[in-house]
Amino acid sequence: MAQVNHDIPFFTQLLRQVFTRPIKIVHAAPVGGGDIHHCYQIVLADDSHFFIKCNHARYANLLEQEHYALAALKQAGAIKVPAILGTGECEGYCYLVLEWLELSTSGDETALGRQLAQMHQHNSDRFGWAADNFIGHNAQQNAWCESWATFWREQRLLPQLMMALKNSRGRMLSKYVDDFIAASDALLEHHNPTPALLHGDFWGGNKAYLASGEPVIFDPASYYGDPETDIAFTRLFGGFGADFYTSYNYARSLLAGASTEEAIAAAQASNLPEQVVQRQVLYNIYHQLNHFNLFGEGYLSDCEQAISNVIKFTR
């Protein structure tokens, strides 16, 4: 992340582009917010608080696509997301201004599971998104597609694989590519999910809770796809408890038309169907490859093992 030097005059000018009211900043300090953008808490004299992401103007599309995804999640109305207050460019920097929320890592996981199931009820007639966006700072392709198997192959796996093969260490994956892609097609050939609104980067670091316990989600990489992909990623790095999964499975079953008894049984099931487990391994390879492409060879052995497992599933 390139160094930038932002001060109160800069943020004053930035906020004057967003608001028509007088701007008097009494506090401006960097805060944590990821490894791509510079993030700040800004406090005005009237005690208004804001969260601002900034970066060099060449990264404007990353923040524009985050804005677009947050707006879609907010419109769905299922889970709270930070309110979007403004985006634009100021003095050679792009920015995204959001409401400031006091967040905690613990809260109502039952509500999070239920609300995610409700969000996944917002559907499209095709897989994809209105624009390509980003997963981390890597490009995420989202061309509309009628077939889920085709979308997953062409828009998810192959772009990450081709990126990995350009890395001298990643070239070792080349021996798996043909068999792996064939295995992906086989696993998804008869799997026909309804395209659902997804968070797209739903790991434990992209959810939090208000003091009331209400869930909040952020940093999306949204598109319309298989809801199982969001759930799969929650299992890759952990951070979600049993209450989340029980609540999600119960609500998802009810929303799909199951009886209360059937929904309870789904929520209490101790083991996932084998096909679901296999798809979760397949779906998480996308994120494992992305982590290799972002952060390097520490993720290479995980990619190789998972790819080998997917190939074995279809033999």
Q: What do these predicted ranges mean?
A:
Residues D7-R21, S124-L197, L210-S212:
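An alpha-helical support segment within catalytic cores of ATP-dependent transferases
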Residues P22, D46-F50, E214:
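Short acidic/polar mixed-charge low-complexity motifs
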Residues P22, G77, G88, H120-F127, ...:
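A general structural signal marking secondary-structure boundaries and capping sites
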Residues P22-A29:
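Conserved N-terminal boundary motif of the eukaryotic protein kinase catalytic domain
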Residues A29-T150:
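ATP-binding pocket architecture of kinase catalytic cores
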Residues Y59, A258-E261, H291-R315:
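ATP/Mg2+ or Mg2+-diphosphate-binding catalytic cores
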Residues Q141-R153, M162, H191-L197, Y209-Q288, ...:
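Active-site Asp-x-Gly
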Residues L198, W203-G204:
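Canonical protein kinase catalytic loop motif
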